[in-house]
Amino acid sequence: NFLLRSKGESIEQLRSEVRRRDRETICGIVIPFVERYKEMCREKDSIDFTDAIIVATALCNDGHRPDYDYILVDEFQDISLDRYRFLQSLRRVRPLTKLFCVGDDWQSIYRFAGSDISLFKQFSKYFGYCKECRMETTYRFGNPCVERSSRFILTNREQKEKTVRPFSPDARTDLQFFATSGSGGMAMRVKEILSALPKDSSVYLLGRYGSDVNSLDGNFAVNYGKDGKVAVSCGDRKMAFMTVHQSKGLESDYVILLNCNGGPRGFPSEIADSPVLNYVLSEPDSFEFSEERRVF
């Protein structure tokens, strides 16, 4: 529902666009869900985040004149069409307003939530004249991770090219790969890794999917909190488990990425999107597994 509204399309437009083979899914599942969701919002006299953006855009277009000298936008690589229209409505009523956006197309991993990377890559096409300033120093990690991840990302020539440098030439972040096999092999390997780490160090366990935590057997205690957080303990060591998407922006002394295997539920994910989603999502990159590479 929010993807449909984020793209600025109505149910009628969706009906007219769908191909015959997708019509049963759209008319039998999607449209009834959207209509029931809208009905529920009316009953509770509530709006969601996308509603708030759409309503604010309509207010500006109908004559409301917000008086801003500067508009600052963070995480611009995640911008969606509804947010783009909102920014344009703010600028339209006050043309001298300066728009300052910070983003990194190497971190664009939320297409499934409605983001449209073309708005970032073709900024001047959508917003007019601009000046681009590059920030190429990272304070999160050092080499060899910086060099290896840069080469990995830039294999996709559609990514903006830049030379990322660590904040200090002495900063070091190592990458190690471990093979496992057989039932319980993953859990045993993780236990071996943990036993070699300093006791007072922080550790994150990450997976491409939330179900990856199940690869840890009975040697690990897994607790699912009411807030959705997953806590894992092994002996006296307590750790957080989360998906790679949930971990974005966080830091830890050590990070263990589980189940880097091939297959449908591996990393990269080989699960194909439903063709129905193409009606409400932006166009994907042409490079194979482009978003999965950025997630990794």
Language-model-detected regions and their locations in the chain:
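Conserved helicase NTPase motor core
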Residues: 19-122, 137, 249
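N-terminal accessory segments
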Residues: 1-29
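Inter-lobe coupling/hinge region of RecA-like P-loop helicase motors
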Residues: 130-137, 158-207, 239
